Amino acid sequence: MNFKVRVIDLAGSCCRLGALQFGTKVVETPGCLIYNRSGVVPHLTPDILETLDNVPPIMHTPLASIIEEPGLIKLRGYGKGLASFIGYKDNSVYISASDYQGEAMYQYNENKSISVWTKTGRTKVTPDDYSKFVEVCRPSWYQSLCDTVPANASIKRTRKSVDRTLEFLDQCLKYREKHDSLKTSELWAAVEGGGLVDERQRSAKESATRPVFGFTLEGFGSDQMNVETIFELLPLTTQNLPVEKPRLIHAIGSPTINSLSRSSKLTEVEEENGNDSSNDQDRTATFSLLNLREDRYNEDFSPLVSGCKCFVCSNHTRAYIHHLIINNEMLGGVLLMTHNLFQYIEFFRCIRTSLKNNKWKELRKLFDA
């Protein structure tokens, strides 16, 4: 696996374009990963996902969704890795220790383990337990075990979080060094620090001294982390990380484009297609929330988004999807997820194109308007 990065200086604001290559697959950055639970993308089966264009070739699977089912014993017996087990043979897998889709109960983490919450309750996971599980999953990337705390955690608890996470990282590295089967899986260091600038910087500086492939920025997806705090902490954190290594952030939420700008680049891209995409940017940047349960859509025969080239907008109408939703048809969720995924992937493509063509400020204005 290798990562190529190109830093672009736009009127004093540094941004990065990059390409993360593993085997024949490439993830262009800034970009996104496809989130799934237990190997299932919400509403979409593997065969449907394969029909979509430009889907990132790596699946983000949180530990909590797979540690119980399929679990260590089944995956070890299967012997072909998690990607094959869940039906995504042509895709790769990224395993994260954190999962922001559930409630974070950080107070149950301990000095030698973290608590992972499954359907049957609490499971303690040590760095060695985690590494053994990752070993049978055979992911392309995996995150180091981490003790994530919210922005409002006390100073003492936040410092302990950073200390624990660094110790967990060292133990994951030690296990990886002793087991050749993990050498094909790249380890990403988790950067913690809650809402404290000093601890964020300490975590970043210490993590940067370890032999890791990249970094995950933790804690920005918690409910206690407001937008102003995110904008303050991101640039102060990333400035302490090596420029040549990729960064990944979990659950940044709705201010994604602002976060990309304020963080002085989260990740990076070298786009081969140099076509002007100003029309695409206009379409993607102008949006509103549709509640298709409302009765006013029962005779609306327009597409979800005018000009959208996704399968849903090319073949179906708001009225049809309204009918599916109010009758609780499974196809309604499938079509909405297909459209939203297409739009989100296009959103990042427009960001990359605007950076390459030196039109980042113009794109920002469309979102700020």
Curated annotation (Swiss-Prot):
Question: One Gene Ontology cellular component annotation?
Answer: cytoplasm
Tell where it localizes: Cytoplasm
Thylakoid is among the record's keywords: no
Q: Which cofactor does it need?
A: Zn(2+)
Question: GO MF terms on file?
Answer: metal ion binding; tRNA-guanosine(34) queuine transglycosylase activity
The signal peptide annotation in the UniProt record is: none
Keywords attached to this Swiss-Prot or TrEMBL record, sorted alphabetically, are:
Cytoplasm, Metal-binding, tRNA processing, Zinc
Per UniProt, the cofactor note for this protein states:
Binds 1 zinc ion per subunit.
Q: Which residues bind Zn(2+)?
A: C308, C310, C313, H339
| SUPFAM superfamilies registered for this protein in UniProt | tRNA-guanine transglycosylase (SSF51713)
- Annotated stretches, region: Disordered: 263-282
Q: Which InterPro entries match?
A: QTRTD1, Queuine_tRNA-ribosyltrfase, TGT-like_sf, tRNA_ribo_trans-like
GO biological process: one example? tRNA-guanine transglycosylation
Matches recorded under NCBIfam families: tgt_general (TIGR00449)
**Its biological function?**
Non-catalytic subunit of the queuine tRNA-ribosyltransferase (TGT) that catalyzes the base-exchange of a guanine (G) residue with queuine (Q) at position 34 (anticodon wobble position) in tRNAs with GU(N) anticodons (tRNA-Asp, -Asn, -His and -Tyr), resulting in the hypermodified nucleoside queuosine (7-(((4,5-cis-dihydroxy-2-cyclopenten-1-yl)amino)methyl)-7-deazaguanosine).
* Protein family (similarity comment): Belongs to the queuine tRNA-ribosyltransferase family. QTRT2 subfamily.
Q: What's the subunit arrangement here?
A: Heterodimer of a catalytic subunit and an accessory subunit.
Q: PANTHER family of this UniProt entry?
A: QUEUINE TRNA-RIBOSYLTRANSFERASE ACCESSORY SUBUNIT 2 (PTHR46064:SF1)
According to UniProt, the name of this protein is Queuine tRNA-ribosyltransferase accessory subunit 2
Q: What is the scientific name of the source organism?
A: Trichoplax adhaerens
Lineage in the entry? Eukaryota, Metazoa, Placozoa, Uniplacotomia, Trichoplacea
